[in-house]
Amino acid sequence: MSKPKHIRTLADTEAQAVARNIRVSPRKLNLVAAMIRNQPADKAIAALTFSRRRIAQQVKKTLESAVANAENNHQLDVDQLVVKTAEVGKSIVMKRFHARGRGRSARVEKFFSHLKIVVAERAEAPEETKPSRGTNKEQKAA
């Protein structure tokens, strides 16, 4: 008997997708990732579809991959998926030089990022009924 190749770090109701070395700065990518955190997966995909930011299409592709992983690898219900986390991390930084006036040069840094999206099945919470809004006299009498 051999050991499993890797230990599953996620819960059974979760799936993930990772995009590495995306050519955008982590700061800009985090703006798009913040849009989809804690959103239902279908609403997050719709928001990314109509986002005007360039990187939104790559984030959408990664989110769709996480949803596909949940459906095909873990048999989760696609309609119940919610974006649990969208983590953004730093990757490499390419250094380049830009020619300036008088024979000088300036250093240009091109940032890369990592993106990890975890989707989870939302737990069905029982519907809570709001108490009726009566006057203070009714509340004191009860």
UniProtKB/Swiss-Prot annotation:
One of its GO terms (biological process) is translation. GO terms for molecular function: rRNA binding; structural constituent of ribosome. One of its GO terms (cellular component) is cytosolic large ribosomal subunit. SUPFAM superfamilies: Ribosomal protein L22. Pfam families: Ribosomal_L22 (PF00237). Residues 122-142 are annotated as: Disordered. Keywords: Ribonucleoprotein, Ribosomal protein, RNA-binding, rRNA-binding. Part of the 50S ribosomal subunit. Belongs to the universal ribosomal protein uL22 family. This protein binds specifically to 23S rRNA; its binding is stimulated by other ribosomal proteins, e.g. L4, L17, and L20. It is important during the early stages of 50S assembly. It makes multiple contacts with different domains of the 23S rRNA in the assembled 50S subunit and ribosome. The globular domain of the protein is located near the polypeptide exit tunnel on the outside of the subunit, while an extended beta-hairpin is found that lines the wall of the exit tunnel in the center of the 70S ribosome. This is Large ribosomal subunit protein uL22.
